[in-house]
Amino acid sequence: MAEEVSTLMKATVLMRQPGRVQEIVGALRKGGGDRLQVISDFDMTLSRFAYNGKRCPSSYNILDNSKIISEECRKELTALLHHYYPIEIDPHRTVKEKLPHMVEWWTKAHNLLCQQKIQKFQIAQVVRESNAMLREGYKTFFNTLYHNNIPLFIFSAGIGDILEEIIRQMKVFHPNIHIVSNYMDFNEDGFLQGFKGQLIHTYNKNSSACENSGYFQQLEGKTNVILLGDSIGDLTMADGVPGVQNILKIGFLNDKVEERRERYMDSYDIVLEKDETLDVVNGLLQHILCQGVQLEMQGP
């Protein structure tokens, strides 16, 4: 199968169990588009981690680096990042140990942002003026899913308003997209006063964070899943899907590559090391969808 799906021969692809990947891709192909849904993280998964050696901004960074944030606030947010990010990606701490730190980080950051008199109309401008970039091949990815009626569930611990605006400005915000994220709550005068619903951080991206969405229940029959993430916390994103039959987990290994490679290879079926494109995902989709059509035409 690895021979058939030429995209898996790419140098950035790591697989602990190629035979297992072969089986899963075969099952996804058999089910075709009718049975498939895609569940993805956003920051550093659909968006780029780096471009020309320079780090790209996350949905939070876009706001942090913008003109609408005071210098004072920016310094405080940067201090939080320097304190908590090493904890988030520390391979020697368990998720349980990291949890309280993540809640603390997100809560402090949200409180700082709420003091900034951010207005709803400013979001589009902030995104326009940022260095936000989606991964190479994003148009093919979003359009393929849309044209084949494959639901795309974006589960993000970032800022929903920002990432939605990025996708809109890239002209790929199609009706098959559903987003669960930290959405801003503006008061009647249009100023940011808080964030809606339950706080979503790196390590609670599971069914508990979106049980109220009822989203997966509507997708009965979509029992095959492609999951895309860039952190160990992303592995639970499909936990709310009832009756999953086949799931292919693809992980982008962007940072601290040496320290985290083994853990990622143990956790994800396919690991993409320092790969800033969606080539492998697009190649797999093409393979699954083409074969799905052929199988239908051939009959049982």
UniProtKB/Swiss-Prot annotation:
Keyword Ribonucleoprotein: no
Active-site residue list: 41, 43
Record has Ribosomal protein as a keyword: no
Residues found modified as N6-acetyllysine: 256
Superkingdom: Eukaryota
Residues that hold N(7)-methyl-GMP according to the record: 88
A cellular component term, taken from the record's GO annotations: cytosol
Chain positions recorded as CMP binding sites: 88
Keyword annotations from UniProtKB, A to Z: Acetylation, Cytoplasm, Hydrolase, Magnesium, Metal-binding, Nucleotide metabolism, Nucleotide-binding
Location(s), subcellular: Cytoplasm
UniProt-listed GO biological process terms: nuclear-transcribed mRNA catabolic process, deadenylation-dependent decay; nucleotide metabolic process
EC assignment: 3.1.3.91, 3.1.3.5
Gene Ontology terms for molecular function: 5'-nucleotidase activity; magnesium ion binding; nucleotide binding
Residues that coordinate or bind Mg(2+): 41, 43, 230
Catalytic function, reaction form: N(7)-methyl-GMP + H2O = N(7)-methylguanosine + phosphate; CMP + H2O = cytidine + phosphate; a ribonucleoside 5'-phosphate + H2O = a ribonucleoside + phosphate
Leading EC class: hydrolase
Pfam families: UMPH-1
Sequence positions that bind substrate: 156-157, 205
Function: Specifically hydrolyzes 7-methylguanosine monophosphate (m(7)GMP) to 7-methylguanosine and inorganic phosphate. The specific activity for m(7)GMP may protect cells against undesired salvage of m(7)GMP and its incorporation into nucleic acids. Also has weak activity for CMP. UMP and purine nucleotides are poor substrates.
PANTHER family documented for this protein: 5'-NUCLEOTIDASE (PTHR13045), 7-METHYLGUANOSINE PHOSPHATE-SPECIFIC 5'-NUCLEOTIDASE (PTHR13045:SF15)
Subunit and partners: Monomer.
Family per record: Belongs to the pyrimidine 5'-nucleotidase family.
Protein name: 7-methylguanosine phosphate-specific 5'-nucleotidase
Classification of source organism: Eukaryota, Metazoa, Chordata, Craniata, Vertebrata
